[in-house]
């Protein structure tokens, strides 16, 4: 999570299942390629949801911007912490933007790292305003 200003949030999940070869090659090696202050132990999905809820609690009107619909779906799936149970988050707005000619990965300092990709997306969107 990268706000316009303020503290960033970077979470990595504990995963013991099989990984697609592309993820193994292009994502996993770079999971901890973030500022040292943001490197943390892998979290369970439930702990990650609670950390995300705590982070969002500090925002009166959170707006999540994505350039791919699946990003919104995965974000929302993370909030589900059990059957019929979701993390306690404030009301959240989502905006999916189409950015012809812009590639998050191509503009990211560390392609396919969620933090760096989010920074690239944020910086590009702010440059359009």
Question: How would you describe each model-predicted region?
Answer:
Residues 1-2, 117:
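Gly/Thr-rich phosphate-binding beta-strand-loop-beta motif of the actin/hexokinase/Hsp70
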Residues 2-66, 70:
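Conserved non-catalytic scaffold segment of RNase H-like nuclease domains
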Residues 6, 80, 126:
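Residue-level marker of positions within ordered structural domains that often coincide
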Residues 54, 77, 123-127:
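Residue-level signal for well-ordered alpha-helical scaffold segments within enzymatic catalytic domains
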Residues 68, 104-129:
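Acidic, Mg2+-coordinating catalytic module of metal-dependent nucleases/exonucleases
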Residues 71-90:
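Substrate-recognition/cap helix-loop segment adjacent to the acidic, metal-dependent catalytic center
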Residues 86-109:
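Short, flexible loop segments at boundaries between secondary-structure elements
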């Amino acid at each position: 999570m990268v706000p316009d200003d303020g503290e960033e949030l970077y979470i990595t999940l504990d995963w013991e299942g099989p990984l697609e070869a592309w993820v193994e090659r292009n994502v996993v090696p770079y999971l901890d390629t973030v500022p040292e202050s943001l490197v943390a132990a892998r979290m369970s999905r439930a702990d990650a949801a609670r950390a995300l809820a705590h982070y969002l609690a500090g925002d009166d009107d959170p707006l999540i911007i994505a350039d791919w619909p699946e990003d919104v779906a995965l974000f929302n799936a993370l909030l589900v912490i059990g059957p019929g149970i979701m993390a306690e988050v404030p009301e959240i707005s989502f905006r999916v933007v189409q950015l012809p000619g812009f590639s998050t990965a191509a503009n990211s300092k560390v392609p396919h790292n969620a933090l760096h990709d989010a920074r690239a997306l944020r910086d590009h969107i702010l440059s359009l305003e």
